[in-house]
Amino acid sequence: MTTRAQAPVGVFDSGLGGLSVLRAIRAELPAESLLYLADSRHAPYGEKSPEYIADRTLRVCEWLVDQGCKALVIACNTATAQAVHVLREKLAVPVIGVEPGLKPAVATSKSRVVGVLATESTLRSEKFARLLAGASGDCKVLSQPGYGLVPLIERGDTHSPAVLELLRAYLQPMLDANADTLVLGCTHYPFLEDAIHEIAGDRLTLIDTGHAVARHLGRTLAAAGLQASGQAATPCFMSTGDVLPLQAMVAALLGEAPMAQRVDIGDAPLSPVAVSLASQPE
């Protein structure tokens, strides 16, 4: 076991949604130490330009590598869709992304109608278009941008009248079309499971890919000889914005009361590399 194998895995999201992925990683890979970074100062990413997302994601992930992370999990569907090819081109550590769980949804659906709730940026990306073309099969796929949901979740609001009103508007057309499976295509959306069940009852099977991502990470670390052993260190939590929402969400989700640290990962003009790579397919 090398010293490098005991280094942390960096888990990155534009905000707090990636905590759902961190929870899955801790369950699947309890020996791995984790460093979670929320780029909350710049959230949400979902309605920003592809060039901005690629550049900002690269900047943040370079910072995580500088902190000693042995691998990175991009726990953000939007950042994965727009920037994972940038990261794999530029960084010397394994990079694991997330994508909407369309394949398991298609395998699960009995009505052959599947809903996808994701950010506008994810749904417009070439990566999602390829996924849709390759995985939808004989299913009808209804894609819906989740406008307004991420800012509410970032404030810890997962079940208010405002949240329920938005969800009803987004889900009712899917239910009317006889959808029986819903892909949670943003890592924030697992926090809305209770609210979704209140609206849809048991009519929708929810597909959350957090555990699949964790298992993929485990296989990648094993192949690279980077699996940790022994007792994991307590996770470190960092944010480029206000740390209080992060601390509150960790307490609610993980039952812990960490002291999150605020970090500054400065802005800069869009780099030519990121602008060029953002327009390339993965």
Curated annotation (Swiss-Prot):
It comes from the Bacteria. The active site is at residues 76, 186. Pathway: Cell wall biogenesis; peptidoglycan biosynthesis. Substrate binds at residues 13-14, 45-46, 77-78, 187-188. It catalyses: L-glutamate = D-glutamate. InterPro entries: Asp/Glu/hydantoin_racemase (IPR015942), Asp/Glu_race (IPR001920), Asp/Glu_racemase_AS_1 (IPR018187), Asp/Glu_racemase_AS_2 (IPR033134), Glu_race (IPR004391). Its EC number is 5.1.1.3. Belongs to the aspartate/glutamate racemases family. This is Glutamate racemase.
